[in-house]
């Protein structure tokens, strides 16, 4: 059997926990991280629900042992924390031992600092230093410095499919023999910018979101960061490393329909899943669980369900969206859901799609609603972004 | 009412960047979405912002918009009854 | 960081069968250069909005959605329009095409406009149409819709134009049979300072697909 690229470590911080174990426990007990926003003052406080990371910036900075007065955007803080955990989990001590890269994704970048200091940039030049954190690449660079990675560092920004694309690029870099080890993932913090933006698109729910439910009202935004360590076969053998799972399939396709809306036939999603299966050399019936994109917007869940039905026909595997617990974490979503997919492989279980009551009438394919233990060998994880950018990944236990 | 319709046409052309249209190209009963002016879901959201900004009308559900944004005539009628500014 | 990336590639340049470039197209300083030839040159004083509008009108394209796009998407759209018109690919080839674009400012130009719309307490009306464009990859979505391109899309953010990265990424896509053509390049805009450079990588074409040639053509405007 053609093996994928080995995953040897993972790290995560999200609304449901500050490390892999906490996230795992929350998933096993369907403990939600959705609630009222507290770290950001916004006029929308009462009419949105979010998946917020409880830790404040200074708490995270302290745990990273950052010197005082260092300027880190919240995305850079969350990202550094999760990426460091991943390295530790993979028991990597010397980065320079192998050719190591970092592929990190973000959409928010340093927007949190920019919007905080924006009004004073002209009147108080002292605050201009915060602007340096604005570009998407700044969070990546900061994480790279925290990890000591200098060989290959890049940022991907393709909306909500960003982290899935980062994982795909990392896997390819290893397959092509260009790197021995790649840290891949994404980070996005909550910001007024995204809250207001999604609010104007009228796709934010004022209640806990209900993915794949007939009466879904929209999404809950979330914040998170997660990273995986991918390592080449040669490194695994030489260091006799423990493998958590494999990235066996990956693909990206464009829906070519609308800037934000998904097509009725879910063409992009369909193509991404189809191509990922091909790369993994798997038949649809070999997929045991799908961690769906499932944002709980009217449009995504219908379009994704249509695409799933097109691929799997009458034998749709168990599927669920964990966004009901974490919120939609944008450029981190593909990475945290990759971690959850690996947990599904490790624990041999399927996570329930919480808050679900009634199936979408047009399709009548209900998601998994109960936590269940079962044989799980291959998990598909979907991430679809604005711009029609659709990605699908497959994780396998061997 | 005629003034309001005229004003709406001007605003819509301006707000939605319909550069290829003039006020005279839009009839009061032309369909705004679909075949008519070819507006899409993002345009509908822009129109909701316009209702709030210019006329003090707040819509909270995009579905409400569907019934109001049928044509200039229907929209003007709705604004005339519900405007708060 | 860039220096390091360059070094990284020097260490690992493995080339299989050579690929080609069918055409190049650049937009800068209110000029359009196609395959080394200046095909449009407008007054330097025009703003990007004025310049792009003129180019759109003169091209005779009927695509009213153009006016709704943000400036980064307009630049991406027009550059692809000129380039792909010149390449004249059949639609089934276009459908399988991959897009690999990059820039340094991501969507900063539009981010600023969105930020302006939310910073005033008294006049707080964030525009949905502006927010949609606060992602650099939306321009790729626009050209995918226009030309019905359904292949892989990736958008990278770099400090500066990185020919080697783009070259190896397209080679990998074509050699792994992910795509038969790759539309590649750089599209960057901050207010009126804009620069685009796109080229079509393919198995056949006039130019050799090499870092030196890509860099030379990028510098050509």
Show where each model-derived region lies.
Chain C
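Conserved "HGTGT" condensation-loop signature of ketosynthase/thiolase-family condensing enzymes
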Residues: 1-221
């Amino acid at each position: 059997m053609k093996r994928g690229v080995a995953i040897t470590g993972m790290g995560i911080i999200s609304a449901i926990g500050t490390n892999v174990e906490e996230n795992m426990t929350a998933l096993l007990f369907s403990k939600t991280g959705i609630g009222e926003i507290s770290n950001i003052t916004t006029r929308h406080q009462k009419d949105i629900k979010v998946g917020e990371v409880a830790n404040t910036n200074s708490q995270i900075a302290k745990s990273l042992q950052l010197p005082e007065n260092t300027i880190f955007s919240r995305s850079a803080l969350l990202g550094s924390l999760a990426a460091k955990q991943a390295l530790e989990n993979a028991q990597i001590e010397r980065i320079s031992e192998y050719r190591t890269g970092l592929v990190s994704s973000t959409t928010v970048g340093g927007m949190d600092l920019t919007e905080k200091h924006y009004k004073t940039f002209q009147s108080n030049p002292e605050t201009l230093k915060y602007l340096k954190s604005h570009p998407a690449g700044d969070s990546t660079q900061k994480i790279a410095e925290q990890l000591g990675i200098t060989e290959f560092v890049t940022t991907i920004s393709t909306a909500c499919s960003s982290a899935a694309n980062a994982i795909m690029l990392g896997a390819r870099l290893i397959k092509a023999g260009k790197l021995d080890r790649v840290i891949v993932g994404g980070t996005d913090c909550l910001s007024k910018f995204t809250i207001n933006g999604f609010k104007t698109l009228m796709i934010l729910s004022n209640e806990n979101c209900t993915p794949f439910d007939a009466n879904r009202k929209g999404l809950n935004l979330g914040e998170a960061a997660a990273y995986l360590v991918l390592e080449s076969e040669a490194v695994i053998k030489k260091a006799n490393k423990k493998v958590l799972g494999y990235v066996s399939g990956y693909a990206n396709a464009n829906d070519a329909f609308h800037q934000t809306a998904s097509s009725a036939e879910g063409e992009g999603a369909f193509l991404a899943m189809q191509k990922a299966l091909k790369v993994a050399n798997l038949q649809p019936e070999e997929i045991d669980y799908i961690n769906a994109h499932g944002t709980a917007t009217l449009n995504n869940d219908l379009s994704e369900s249509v695409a799933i039905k097109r691929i799997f026909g009458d034998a749709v595997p168990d599927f669920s969206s964990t966004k009901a617990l974490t919120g939609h974490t944008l450029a981190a979503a593909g990475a945290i859901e990759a971690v959850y997919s690996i947990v599904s492989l490790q624990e041999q279980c399927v996570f329930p799609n919480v808050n679900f009551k009634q199936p979408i009438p047009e399709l009548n394919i209900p998601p998994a609603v109960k936590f269940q233990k079962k044989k799980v060998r291959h998990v598909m994880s979907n991430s679809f972004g604005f711009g029609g950018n659709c990605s699908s990944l497959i994780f396998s236990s061997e | 009412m005629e003034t309001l319709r005229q004003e709406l046409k001007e605003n819509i052309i301006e707000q939605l960047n319909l550069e290829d249209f003039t006020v005279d190209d839009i009839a009061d009963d032309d369909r705004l979405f679909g075949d008519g002016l070819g507006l899409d879901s993002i345009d509908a959201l822009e129109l909701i912002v316009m209702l709030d900004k210019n006329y003090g009308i707040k819509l909270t559900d995009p579905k409400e918009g569907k019934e109001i944004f049928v044509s200039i005539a229907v929209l003007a009628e709705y604004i005339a009854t519900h405007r708060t500014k | 960081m860039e220096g390091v990336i360059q070094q990284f590639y020097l260490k690992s340049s493995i080339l299989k069968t050579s690929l080609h470039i069918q055409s190049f197209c650049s937009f800068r300083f209110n000029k359009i250069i196609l395959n080394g030839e200046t095909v449009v040159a407008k007054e330097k004083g025009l703003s990007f909005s004025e310049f792009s509008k003129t180019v759109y009108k003169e091209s005779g394209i009927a695509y009213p959605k153009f006016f709704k796009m943000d400036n980064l998407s307009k630049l991406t759209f027009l550059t692809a329009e000129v380039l792909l018109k010149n390449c004249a690919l059949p639609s089934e080839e276009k459908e399988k095409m991959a897009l690999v674009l990059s820039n340094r400012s991501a969507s900063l130009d539009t981010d600023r406009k969105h930020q302006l719309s939310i910073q005033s307490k008294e006049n707080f009306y964030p525009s949905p149409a502006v927010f949609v464009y606060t992602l650099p990859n939306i321009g790729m979505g626009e050209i995918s819709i226009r030309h019905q391109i359904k292949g892989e899309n990736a958008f990278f953010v770099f400090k500066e134009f990185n020919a080697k990265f783009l070259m190896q990424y397209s080679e990998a896509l074509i050699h792994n049979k992910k795509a038969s053509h790759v539309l590649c390049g750089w599209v960057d805009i901050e207010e009126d300072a804009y620069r685009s450079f796109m080229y079509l990588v393919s198995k056949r074409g006039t130019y050799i697909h090499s870092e030196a040639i890509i860099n030379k053509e990028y510098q050509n405007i």
